[in-house]
Structures are given as structure tokens and as C-alpha cells.
């Protein structure tokens, strides 16, 4: 319900999105990826109207990581086959790459996997189903950014991981997004992350954006300030347990 969301994606480095369950965060992402067609308004990406573009076409330019680390990979396929599939999805490689992965592509995959610092470059022939949740999420991140997307959507992509692994995957995310200068939308229930990561914070309630802050005003805000702004604009307290617990966690 906020026209600024569709107008401003192209000029933003990274936005954090906060809201309680049912606020519309996942619905927003589904509208962007083409999971359903919006009832009204339009969705622009890089100046191009993608409102009615099919989901498979949008997937070539939009990367998407889910909270569940099992959703972004094919478990019965090997690591290198998953990476080859990511190449195909982006439309940057011929179909033949999937049946016969060239030495050049294997070398590229090995190089990119080594950057994850998880030893996956030495396990390229192993099925992805044998990896841990954190390893699979890191691989999904690599697949989503192997060919730089116009937009990267992160739907609480570290929430299901243990704290140490979540921190590592988040660090990888920050590094890749910064290096490739990827426009990114990230849903989080962590209030500290909402203020510390990226350069803009949005708060949602009942399908609408109730608070939007950036720049100097954002840099001065505390978690309590953010919660108070939500109360003022939404007319109620933000009472999600995970969000409130994150007030005292860093």
C-alpha cells in the first residue's frame, strides 16, 4: 500500500523490514517475486515494469533466500549441479552446462565456494542433502548472487540457524552485498539488525508501511525509539515475542 516501495527500490543499497506476524512482509516479497499478481499499483525494478511478468522471468533478476535453509537448494543434486542450476536460472549459460559442467565453470564454482570458508570447494561432488543447515543457506546465498541480481530478498534467512552459524552467514551476506553493490531488502525480527544493517528501516503493520527512517535520523535511533515510533504510527504496541526478545540481544 505504499507507492514509495515501488518507486524507490533502484536507488537503495539495503533496507531492513520489521513487523509482527501477519504484517505483510512475506506477502510483499511474494508480490515482488511474482508469487501472485498485486490487486493494484505497479512494481518497477530498474525502471522496468514487472507487475505482470511471470515468476520464472523475475527469478532471472531477483535472488530470494528463505528462513528455511532447505528451500533454496535441490538436496539430491550435487553442490556443483546446484551452482550450475543457478547459472541456468539466471539465463547466462547454455542448457548444456547442466549435462556437462566445463572445467572453466568448475574452477569458477570452486573459487566462489572457497570464499565461504566452509570447505565446500572440496565437496563439490557431494549431494547438497548431506550439508548442514548453515552450509546450505550459505550455498543458497552464493547461488542467488553467482550472477549479480538486480534485487536480493532476504526473508529472515538466518533465523533458523544457531547463533554462531547465523553470525557467519550474516557476515557473508554483508560481504557479498557490499562487494557486488546489490540492492537488497531484508526482513528481520532482530531490532538491533534493523537499525545497524543497511541504510534504511521500514516498519510494517496490516499490509502497510507505518514508519520509514533513513539517514541521520536513523543513525541516532535506539531500539526503544523504533518501538515508540511504531506505537505512535500504528496505534498499538509491537508485541511480537521474537522482536521484543531481540531488544536485549545483540
Walk through the language-model features, giving the residues of each.
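The feature captures the beta-strand-to-loop junction immediately N-terminal to the Walker
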Residues: 18-20
Amino acid at each position: 500500500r505504499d507507492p514509495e516501495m515501488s518507486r524507490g527500490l533502484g536507488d537503495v543499497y539495503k533496507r531492513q523490514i520489521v513487523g509482527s506476524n501477519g504484517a505483510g512482509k512475506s506477502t510483499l516479497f511474494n508480490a515482488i517475486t511474482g508469487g501472485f499478481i498485486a490487486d493494484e499499483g505497479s512494481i518497477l525494478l530498474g525502471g522496468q515494469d514487472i507487475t505482470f511478468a511471470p515468476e520464472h522471468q523475475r527469478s532471472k533478476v531477483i535472488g530470494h533466500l528463505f528462513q528455511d535453509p532447505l528451500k533454496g537448494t535441490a538436496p539430491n543434486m550435487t553442490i556443483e549441479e546446484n551452482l550450475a542450476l543457478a547459472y541456468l536460472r539466471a539465463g547466462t549459460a547454455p542448457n548444456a552446462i547442466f549435462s556437462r559442467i566445463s572445467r572453466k565453470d568448475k574452477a569458477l564454482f570452486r573459487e566462489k565456494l572457497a570464499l565461504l570458508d566452509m570447505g565446500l570447494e572440496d565437496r563439490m561432488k557431494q549431494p547438497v542433502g548431506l550439508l548442514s543447515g548453515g552450509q546450505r543457506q550459505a550455498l543458497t546465498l552464493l547461488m542467488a548472487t553467482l550472477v549479480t541480481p538486480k534485487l536480493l530478498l532476504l526473508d529472515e534467512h538466518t533465523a533458523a540457524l544457531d547463533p554462531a552459524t547465523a553470525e557467519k552467514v550474516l557476515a557473508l551476506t554483508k560481504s557479498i552485498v557490499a562487494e557486488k553493490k546489490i540492492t537488497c531488502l531484508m526482513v528481520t525480527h532482530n531490532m538491533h539488525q534493523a537499525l545497524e544493517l543497511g541504510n534504511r528501516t521500514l516498519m510494517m503493520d496490516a499490509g502497510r508501511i507505518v514508519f520509514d527512517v533513513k539517514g541521520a535520523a536513523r543513525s541516532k535511533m535506539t531500539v526503544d525509539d523504533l518501538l515508540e515510533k511504531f506505537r505512535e504510527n500504528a496505534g498499538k504496541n509491537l508485541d511480537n515475542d521474537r522482536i521484543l526478545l531481540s531488544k536485549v540481544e545483540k
